């Protein structure tokens, strides 16, 4: 049980970390693209409506079965909420603050690092939080292509008509999702600038 729980968490963590590293820079880049950004976000929204099992099945002809295609599929899925929230969060930064940054001689990179990302951090973290919780649930389907994790118990239970196996897989997944949601909620609170915290508290 402990091994399967760790395996499940490992698959989810690798996928979401890779998703963050890919989606945040891409989201920032899209805010610099006057043309095409809306189309990309629209495609992302459409892809997110596809069944996760279909995405997993899509990677089988490309990468075979096992942990690698499972992580690849989960990585692909993890990018979507993070990319959308990064794009939305950066666009939501007050333009007057950016003009002020230019006025004091900030480079484009300094504006991103010191102004845009800190102010967009709560929205980006909300995307990471959503993505992480989704992935913990979706990772149960990794068992379908030999990726392991707690989904193994669920699939065994379904195949053998043994509800205790289903419970043995479903309960830890629920606990993991709740724990990750709590921890990322605390992180989201910490990365929120004090000024934004005051606005939220007042509302």
Give the positions of each predicted feature:
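Periplasmic/extracellular loop-to-transmembrane helix junction in inner-membrane transport proteins
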Residues: 1-15
């Amino acid at each position: 049980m402990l091994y399967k729980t760790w395996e499940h968490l490992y698959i989810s963590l690798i996928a979401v970390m890779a998703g963050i590293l890919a989606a945040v820079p891409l989201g920032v880049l899209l805010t610099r693209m006057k043309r095409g950004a809306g189309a990309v976000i629209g495609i992302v929204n459409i892809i997110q409506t596809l069944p996760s099992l279909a995405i997993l099945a899509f990677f089988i002809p490309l990468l075979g079965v096992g942990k690698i295609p499972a992580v690849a599929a989960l990585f692909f899925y993890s990018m979507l909420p993070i990319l959308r929230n990064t794009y939305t969060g950066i666009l939501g930064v007050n333009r007057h603050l950016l003009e002020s940054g230019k006025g004091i001689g900030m480079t484009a990179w300094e504006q991103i690092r010191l102004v845009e990302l800190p102010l967009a951090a709560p929205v980006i973290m909300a995307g990471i939080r959503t993505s992480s919780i989704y992935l913990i649930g979706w990772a149960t389907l990794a068992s379908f292509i030999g990726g392991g994790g707690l989904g193994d118990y669920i699939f065994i239970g379904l195949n053998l008509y043994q509800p205790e196996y289903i419970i043995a897989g479903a309960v830890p997944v629920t606990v993991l999702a709740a724990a990750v949601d709590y921890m990322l909620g605390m992180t989201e609170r910490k990365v929120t600038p004090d000024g934004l915290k005051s606005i939220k508290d007042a509302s």
